[in-house]
């Protein structure tokens, strides 16, 4: 009944243009939070694992055929993570889920960077192959860490829920459009820059950069992102207007 009433009120409410939303102090801050959430969602580096796992595994010594076959493990981790996420977002506060996600990803990617730095790079030879001295567990360790990373990301995703709850009714259309647009632009950028990054800088630097970005995202969730779960949509709008005016 609440959603029916909210939908009725939104239909009757004047819709703001992007210019109106941007020129009003409190709604501009909400737009910026939405944009940042969308961008950080892609800057987790999740698509580097979903799109390029065979390339990553090949870079640590797996054969091309095995690299493609082992990609199924991240798919399994993604499915389990998505299922777990349904329970997580219903059980915990939105901010807490976001903090869990970013903290977990920061740890996973920092660990992955260290494995590349100390377990992979010292054994890589000039022709791109690896010394027989490289511990046999290292490639499998990379696979396990990437699978954990994918699981954490999929089980802790709250961005799409925030998109539906964060924006007041009068700017929900333009707010969602702008935030989602920025999300997909960032998706394209990360997808395009990852191959040359790992080729030129190596896995340690590449994933070190993504870990640092996720640490910034963690601070953003802790310091900036408001809670929305325990309030109605009207209460969220009233609270945000008071906070950001």
Where do the model's predicted regions map?
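Alpha-helical transmembrane bundle of multi-pass membrane proteins
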Residues: 4-245
């Amino acid at each position: 009944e609440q959603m029916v009433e909210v939908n009725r009120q939104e239909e009757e409410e004047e819709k703001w243009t992007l210019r109106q939303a941007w020129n009003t102090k409190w709604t501009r801050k909400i737009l910026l939070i939405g944009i940042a959430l969308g961008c950080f969602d892609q800057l987790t580096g999740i698509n580097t694992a979903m799109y390029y796992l065979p390339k990553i595994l090949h870079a640590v010594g797996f054969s091309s055929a095995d690299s493609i076959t082992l990609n199924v493990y991240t798919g399994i981790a993604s499915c389990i993570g998505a299922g777990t996420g349904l329970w997580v977002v219903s059980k915990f506060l939105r901010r807490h889920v976001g903090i869990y996600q970013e903290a977990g990803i920061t740890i996973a990617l920092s660990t992955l960077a260290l494995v590349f730095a100390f377990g992979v790079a010292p054994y890589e030879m000039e022709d791109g192959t690896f010394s027989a001295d490289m511990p046999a567990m290292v490639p499998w360790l990379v696979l396990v860490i990437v699978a954990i990373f994918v699981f954490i990301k999929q089980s802790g995703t709250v961005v799409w829920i925030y998109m539906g709850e964060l924006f007041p009714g009068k700017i929900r259309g333009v707010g969602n459009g702008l935030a989602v647009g920025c999300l997909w632009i960032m998706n394209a950028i990360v997808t395009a820059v990852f191959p040359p990054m790992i080729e030129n800088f190596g896995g340690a630097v590449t994933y070190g950069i993504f870990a640092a970005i996720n640490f910034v995202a963690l601070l953003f969730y802790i310091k900036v992102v408001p809670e929305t779960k325990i309030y109605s949509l009207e209460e969220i709008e009233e609270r945000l207007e008071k906070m950001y005016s």
